[in-house]
UniProtKB/Swiss-Prot annotation:
Composition bias type Basic residues, residue spans: 1-20
Organism: Tropheryma whipplei (strain Twist) (Whipple's bacillus)
One of the Pfam families matching this protein, by short name: Ribosomal_L34
Organism domain of life: Bacteria
Gene Ontology CC terms: ribonucleoprotein complex; ribosome
Entry's family note: Belongs to the bacterial ribosomal protein bL34 family.
Name of the protein described by the UniProt record: Large ribosomal subunit protein bL34
HAMAP family: Ribosomal_bL34 (MF_00391)
């Protein structure tokens, strides 16, 4: 039997989906601007 795919890890979560990592790429900045446009409560993880 295979293990569950979600193995929570705070550091990995932020490194992958955090604000700094989003801002470091053009597509990430696009994600943030789209979420700002939608008035999302949380922009990033």
């Amino acid at each position: 039997m295979s293990k569950r795919t979600y193995q929570p890890n705070k550091r990995k979560r932020l490194k992958t989906h955090g604000f700094r990592s989003r801002m470091s790429t053009a597509s990430g900045r696009r994600i943030i601007s789209c979420r700002r446009r939608k008035n999302r409560e949380t922009l990033t993880a």
